[in-house]
């Protein structure tokens, strides 16, 4: 009865247009008040405790790092470097946009931030060179999803907090899938470009390439600092996020000098707004997940699945279907916090590696970011290009097929996710 009330109230609130964070918190709070012996005071304590997780402290720092990198002109230098690397290939500007998304993803940890930073520059450049705007918009919208797959990733941090999994292992596990997806997108773009006879830029000289690499070097070093520092044990993922924020501010203010000190309060305010919004969603989602755990729903479902005799591949198929449906209607962090505690014990029972499950969930969240009606990347791409939302959706959907094929690869070839952590002795 309790769990039926919880989900019916959640779907009712979402159906009438209540924001997802409020829907999660209100349904969880009312369920506790009506069906739990806990007092109103304990509800406030629980809401605070759910957002007090040490791992989640990485989120505001990664958001701040991305804000400094975007405002400080790092994205423009990364795009110039990507163009210098692959711009001479047929369809090179589009391939360079994917490469730039991969590079910026390794700095920001956020998919919408990647789309905004790269798309605002790369799409306009493609249009000026004769590419169809819809073609460029579709590519950047999809390639921007790499922001949550290539480490550092805010969604991975949330999964780690929900399942008590190592953030460092998740970050390392995301490297190969992120590179593989980027490579697949580049190959498909090249094939399409050959068919459509899209233009290529003149090949740059070695001197020009070295100049672009030198300008982008300070941004590229951040990837080495984050992953190298975590793997070497120099600092934890949360400490790495803090180091990234300080480093990004230093580069933007004193190395590239694209920012003035007077602009810092604005950057801090914008990243603070994003942090508050995301943490509000996370706190309410964790309250909702607390109700699920209190009612022992994950344990009940795990027992039921075990009795059904589902094989691991069948279970993962069900996981993907549920996540793909949820991704159409909910924000990634909320989905992770609600469903990860349910899927996690079942996966452990079936012998599925928790890191592998985490990468599968992240790839599903990537797809959710580009599927209507609430795919955030679609709205960001529409705002960046000035295209109507419907046109943006039509531009992005053909490339969605690539992500679905990639999801199958990641789901049923665990080595894609686990080979690098195992090779580094992190298994």
Show where each model-derived region lies.
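Alpha-helical transmembrane segments of multi-pass membrane transport proteins
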Residues: 1-427
């Amino acid at each position: 009865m309790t769990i039926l009330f919880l989900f019916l109230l959640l779907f009712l609130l979402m159906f009438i247009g209540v924001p997802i964070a409020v829907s999660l918190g209100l349904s969880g709070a009312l369920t506790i008040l009506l069906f739990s012996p806990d007092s109103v005071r304990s509800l406030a304590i629980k809401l605070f405790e759910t957002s007090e997780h040490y791992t989640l402290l990485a989120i505001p720092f990664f958001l701040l790092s991305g804000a400094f990198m975007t405002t400080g002109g790092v994205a423009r230098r990364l795009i110039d470097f990507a163009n210098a690397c692959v711009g001479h290939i047929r369809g090179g500007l589009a391939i360079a946009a994917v490469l730039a998304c991969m590079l910026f993803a390794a700095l920001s940890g956020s998919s919408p931030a990647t789309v905004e930073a790269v798309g605002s520059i790369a799409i306009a450049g493609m249009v000026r060179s004769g590419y169809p705007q819809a073609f460029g918009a579709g590519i950047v919208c999809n390639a921007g999803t790499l922001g949550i797959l290539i480490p550092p990733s805010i969604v991975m941090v949330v999964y780690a907090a929900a399942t008590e999994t190592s953030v460092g292992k998740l970050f390392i596990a995301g490297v190969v899938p992120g590179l593989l997806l980027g490579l697949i997108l580049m190959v498909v773009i090249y094939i399409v470009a050959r068919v459509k006879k899209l233009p290529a830029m003149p090949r740059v000289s070695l001197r020009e390439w070295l100049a672009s690499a030198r300008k982008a070097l300070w941004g590229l070093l951040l990837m080495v600092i984050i992953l190298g520092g975590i793997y070497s044990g120099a600092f934890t993922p949360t400490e790495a996020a803090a180091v990234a924020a300080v480093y990004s501010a230093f580069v933007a203010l004193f190395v590239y000098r694209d920012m003035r000190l007077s602009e810092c309060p604005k950057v801090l305010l914008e990243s603070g707004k994003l942090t508050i919004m995301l943490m509000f969603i996370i706190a309410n989602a964790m309250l909702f997940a607390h109700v699920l755990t209190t009612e022992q729903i994950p344990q009940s479902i795990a027992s039921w699945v075990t009795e059904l005799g589902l094989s691991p591949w069948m279970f993962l198929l069900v996981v993907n279907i549920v996540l793909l449906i949820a991704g159409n209607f909910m924000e990634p962090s909320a989905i992770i916090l609600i469903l990860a505690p349910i899927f996690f014990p079942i996966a452990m029972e079936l012998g599925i590696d928790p890191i592998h499950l985490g990468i599968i969930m992240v790839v599903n969240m990537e797809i959710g970011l580009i599927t209507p009606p609430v795919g955030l990347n679609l709205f960001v791409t529409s705002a960046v290009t000035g295209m109507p939302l419907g046109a943006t959706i039509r531009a992005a959907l053909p490339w969605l097929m690539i992500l679905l094929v990639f999801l199958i690869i990641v789901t049923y070839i665990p080595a894609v996710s686990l080979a690098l952590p195992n090779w580094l002795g992190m298994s």
